[in-house]
A protein has these predicted regions:
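Acidic, Ser/Thr-rich low-complexity segments on the non-lumenal side of membrane proteins
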Residues: 56-92
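A hydrophobic, helix-centered structural microdomain
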Residues: 1-65, 155-180
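Hydrophobic structural segments characteristic of membrane proteins
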Residues: 46-50, 55, 81-180
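Residue-level signal for short amphipathic helical patches enriched in basic/charged
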Residues: 27-30, 74-78, 94, 145
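A short linear-motif detector with a strong N-terminal bias
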Residues: 26-28, 39-41, 71-72, 101-106
Length: 180
Protein backbone atom coordinates (compact mmCIF):
# COMPACT_ATOMS: atom_id res chain seq x y z
CA UNK A 1 0.00 0.00 0.00
CA UNK A 2 2.81 2.40 0.86
CA UNK A 3 4.39 1.69 -2.54
CA UNK A 4 1.12 2.60 -4.31
CA UNK A 5 0.80 5.85 -2.36
CA UNK A 6 4.42 6.76 -3.17
CA UNK A 7 3.90 5.89 -6.85
CA UNK A 8 0.76 8.01 -6.98
CA UNK A 9 2.58 10.90 -5.29
CA UNK A 10 5.43 10.61 -7.82
CA UNK A 11 2.90 10.66 -10.67
CA UNK A 12 1.13 13.78 -9.42
CA UNK A 13 4.38 15.53 -8.56
CA UNK A 14 5.78 14.78 -12.00
CA UNK A 15 2.60 15.90 -13.76
CA UNK A 16 2.50 19.15 -11.78
CA UNK A 17 6.16 19.83 -12.51
CA UNK A 18 5.64 19.06 -16.21
CA UNK A 19 2.67 21.43 -16.40
CA UNK A 20 4.41 24.31 -14.61
CA UNK A 21 7.67 23.96 -16.55
CA UNK A 22 5.89 23.64 -19.92
CA UNK A 23 3.84 26.75 -19.14
CA UNK A 24 6.94 28.72 -18.12
CA UNK A 25 8.89 27.60 -21.19
CA UNK A 26 6.03 28.50 -23.52
CA UNK A 27 5.84 31.97 -21.96
CA UNK A 28 9.59 32.46 -22.44
CA UNK A 29 9.97 30.71 -25.80
CA UNK A 30 6.93 32.08 -27.63
CA UNK A 31 9.07 34.42 -29.80
CA UNK A 32 11.15 31.42 -30.94
CA UNK A 33 7.98 29.43 -31.63
CA UNK A 34 6.60 32.33 -33.65
CA UNK A 35 9.83 32.63 -35.66
CA UNK A 36 9.87 28.89 -36.34
CA UNK A 37 6.23 29.09 -37.41
CA UNK A 38 7.06 31.88 -39.87
CA UNK A 39 10.05 30.00 -41.29
CA UNK A 40 8.71 26.42 -41.37
CA UNK A 41 4.96 26.86 -41.57
CA UNK A 42 2.39 25.22 -39.34
CA UNK A 43 3.19 22.51 -36.84
CA UNK A 44 2.97 18.94 -38.07
CA UNK A 45 1.12 16.21 -36.21
CA UNK A 46 2.86 12.87 -35.93
CA UNK A 47 0.80 9.86 -34.78
CA UNK A 48 2.36 8.20 -31.73
CA UNK A 49 1.42 5.76 -29.01
CA UNK A 50 1.25 7.26 -25.54
CA UNK A 51 0.52 6.10 -22.04
CA UNK A 52 -1.49 2.86 -21.91
CA UNK A 53 -0.84 2.58 -25.70
CA UNK A 54 -3.42 5.29 -26.40
CA UNK A 55 -2.79 7.07 -29.71
CA UNK A 56 -2.02 10.79 -29.70
CA UNK A 57 -0.58 13.31 -32.14
CA UNK A 58 2.84 14.74 -31.30
CA UNK A 59 3.37 18.32 -32.46
CA UNK A 60 6.64 19.33 -34.12
CA UNK A 61 7.95 21.45 -36.97
CA UNK A 62 9.09 19.72 -40.15
CA UNK A 63 12.66 20.99 -40.53
CA UNK A 64 15.01 20.03 -43.39
CA UNK A 65 18.30 18.41 -42.41
CA UNK A 66 20.53 20.70 -44.47
CA UNK A 67 22.26 24.06 -44.10
CA UNK A 68 21.34 26.30 -41.18
CA UNK A 69 18.40 24.04 -40.44
CA UNK A 70 20.88 21.66 -38.82
CA UNK A 71 21.29 24.14 -35.96
CA UNK A 72 17.54 24.12 -35.32
CA UNK A 73 17.61 20.32 -35.32
CA UNK A 74 20.76 20.07 -33.19
CA UNK A 75 19.24 22.31 -30.52
CA UNK A 76 15.96 20.39 -30.93
CA UNK A 77 14.03 23.61 -31.42
CA UNK A 78 11.81 21.83 -33.96
CA UNK A 79 10.43 19.85 -31.00
CA UNK A 80 9.32 22.96 -29.05
CA UNK A 81 5.66 22.45 -30.07
CA UNK A 82 5.73 19.23 -28.02
CA UNK A 83 5.40 21.56 -25.02
CA UNK A 84 1.72 21.72 -25.98
CA UNK A 85 1.62 17.91 -25.77
CA UNK A 86 3.09 18.16 -22.27
CA UNK A 87 0.43 20.70 -21.26
CA UNK A 88 -2.29 18.39 -22.60
CA UNK A 89 -0.87 15.45 -20.65
CA UNK A 90 0.03 13.41 -23.73
CA UNK A 91 3.75 13.62 -22.94
CA UNK A 92 6.16 14.37 -20.13
CA UNK A 93 9.57 16.04 -20.11
CA UNK A 94 11.25 12.74 -19.22
CA UNK A 95 9.95 9.33 -20.21
CA UNK A 96 10.35 6.58 -22.76
CA UNK A 97 10.73 7.65 -26.36
CA UNK A 98 7.44 8.32 -28.20
CA UNK A 99 6.67 5.37 -30.45
CA UNK A 100 5.31 5.64 -34.00
CA UNK A 101 2.00 3.87 -34.32
CA UNK A 102 3.10 1.49 -37.12
CA UNK A 103 6.33 -0.04 -35.78
CA UNK A 104 5.07 -0.15 -32.18
CA UNK A 105 2.27 -2.52 -33.02
CA UNK A 106 4.71 -4.93 -34.68
CA UNK A 107 7.38 -4.78 -31.98
CA UNK A 108 6.18 -6.51 -28.82
CA UNK A 109 9.04 -5.02 -26.78
CA UNK A 110 7.31 -1.66 -26.90
CA UNK A 111 4.34 -3.01 -24.97
CA UNK A 112 6.53 -2.54 -21.91
CA UNK A 113 6.73 1.23 -22.41
CA UNK A 114 3.00 1.86 -22.45
CA UNK A 115 2.62 2.40 -18.70
CA UNK A 116 4.52 5.72 -18.76
CA UNK A 117 3.92 8.94 -20.64
CA UNK A 118 6.38 9.36 -23.51
CA UNK A 119 9.04 11.95 -22.86
CA UNK A 120 10.60 14.85 -24.71
CA UNK A 121 13.90 13.53 -23.32
CA UNK A 122 14.53 9.83 -22.87
CA UNK A 123 17.30 7.55 -21.71
CA UNK A 124 17.82 6.24 -25.26
CA UNK A 125 18.34 9.78 -26.61
CA UNK A 126 21.00 10.54 -23.99
CA UNK A 127 22.79 7.25 -24.53
CA UNK A 128 22.79 7.65 -28.30
CA UNK A 129 24.70 10.94 -27.87
CA UNK A 130 27.25 9.72 -25.37
CA UNK A 131 29.81 7.00 -24.88
CA UNK A 132 27.43 4.71 -22.99
CA UNK A 133 26.96 1.23 -24.36
CA UNK A 134 23.36 0.15 -24.57
CA UNK A 135 21.41 -2.61 -26.23
CA UNK A 136 18.89 -0.43 -28.00
CA UNK A 137 15.90 1.79 -27.74
CA UNK A 138 13.49 -0.80 -26.38
CA UNK A 139 16.00 -1.94 -23.74
CA UNK A 140 16.54 1.67 -22.62
CA UNK A 141 12.79 2.24 -22.43
CA UNK A 142 12.31 -0.95 -20.39
CA UNK A 143 15.12 0.13 -18.05
CA UNK A 144 13.41 3.50 -17.58
CA UNK A 145 10.12 1.77 -16.81
CA UNK A 146 11.73 -0.25 -14.02
CA UNK A 147 13.47 2.75 -12.45
CA UNK A 148 10.83 5.42 -13.13
CA UNK A 149 10.44 8.07 -10.46
CA UNK A 150 11.26 11.66 -9.66
CA UNK A 151 14.86 10.83 -8.76
CA UNK A 152 15.41 8.99 -12.05
CA UNK A 153 13.79 11.80 -14.03
CA UNK A 154 16.01 14.43 -12.40
CA UNK A 155 19.08 12.33 -13.21
CA UNK A 156 18.04 11.97 -16.85
CA UNK A 157 17.16 15.67 -17.13
CA UNK A 158 20.57 16.66 -15.72
CA UNK A 159 22.31 14.41 -18.24
CA UNK A 160 20.23 15.87 -21.08
CA UNK A 161 21.96 19.26 -20.86
CA UNK A 162 25.49 18.08 -21.77
CA UNK A 163 24.02 15.60 -24.27
CA UNK A 164 22.19 18.46 -25.99
CA UNK A 165 25.14 20.85 -25.96
CA UNK A 166 27.97 18.43 -26.73
CA UNK A 167 26.21 15.26 -27.82
CA UNK A 168 27.89 13.97 -30.91
CA UNK A 169 28.99 10.61 -29.64
CA UNK A 170 31.86 11.91 -27.51
CA UNK A 171 30.07 13.13 -24.39
CA UNK A 172 31.21 11.57 -21.12
CA UNK A 173 28.32 11.09 -18.72
CA UNK A 174 27.93 8.66 -15.83
CA UNK A 175 26.44 5.26 -16.64
CA UNK A 176 23.90 5.40 -13.83
CA UNK A 177 20.28 6.31 -14.38
CA UNK A 178 19.99 8.20 -11.10
CA UNK A 179 22.43 10.98 -10.31
CA UNK A 180 20.90 12.09 -7.02
Amino acid sequence: LAHRVAARWDTWLKRGFDFLLATALLLVMWPVLLLLRLVYGPMRRYPQLGRWCEPFEEFAFAVPESGLHRVVRALRLHRLPALFNILRGDMSFVGPRPVNVGPAVRDRLYRRTCSARPGLVCLHWIRSRSNIDFEGEAASDAEYELAAGVRTDVGIALRAVPALLYGSGDTEVPDTVSLL
